[in-house]
């Protein structure tokens, strides 16, 4: 692994310890991390790291989802690292930009990992996103603002997200992880 990314490598090792059933996925993330110096740049056309937020309410009972304009589906806030190897900071920045919720804070270590294909669009070829997800908690103010990347935003009960077959499998997985963690 390149010596300038040891922090993410250590965070991935910690995640593997906490989620031993995801060894293969963590290994794929580590191989990708070591593959090229530009893995945090969207210009790296094979794929790149992204940071996302599992944005929960102050009481932890609800999650804020966005209906993504380009992908036309409900997702968690998140986006490109744009050269920033500190993916928790990326997740927080994207949550703030995409929701407008004030007083957000990142909690703890990596919460979830997801590797998924992004379809070709315009001059951008199909590519991989290596998405590193963190819990981001709202404070008392849960008011949101819809920006140009979203068609809608909605607070949803985590327990409902876990069982909603119309939602992306990774959202349901994160909801189940959250429910197990907060029983």
Regions found by a protein language model. Give the residues of each.
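Hydrophobic alpha-helical segments that drive targeting, anchoring, or assembly
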Residues: 54-55, 81-83
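Generic N-terminal amphipathic, Lys/Arg-enriched alpha-helix
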Residues: 4-16
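Unchanged
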Residues: 82-170
């Amino acid at each position: 692994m390149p010596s300038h990314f040891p922090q993410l490598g250590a965070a991935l090792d910690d995640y593997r310890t906490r989620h031993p059933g995801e060894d293969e996925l963590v290994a794929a993330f580590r191989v990708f991390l070591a593959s090229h110096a530009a893995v945090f740049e969207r210009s790296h056309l094979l794929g790149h790291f992204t940071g996302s937020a599992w944005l929960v309410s102050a009481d932890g009972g609800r999650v804020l989802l966005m209906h993504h304009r380009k992908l036309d589906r409900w997702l968690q806030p998140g986006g490109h690292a744009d050269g920033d190897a500190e993916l928790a900071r990326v997740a927080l920045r994207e949550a703030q930009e995409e929701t407008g919720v004030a007083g957000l804070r990142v909690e703890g270590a990596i919460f979830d990992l997801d590797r998924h294909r992004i379809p070709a669009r315009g001059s951008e070829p199909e590519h991989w996103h290596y998405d590193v997800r963190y819990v981001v908690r709202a404070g008392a103010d849960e008011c949101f603002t819809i920006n140009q990347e979203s068609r809608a935003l909605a607070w949803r009960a985590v327990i409902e997200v876990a069982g909603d077959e119309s939602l992306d499998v990774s959202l349901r997985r994160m909801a189940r992880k959250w429910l197990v963690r907060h029983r």
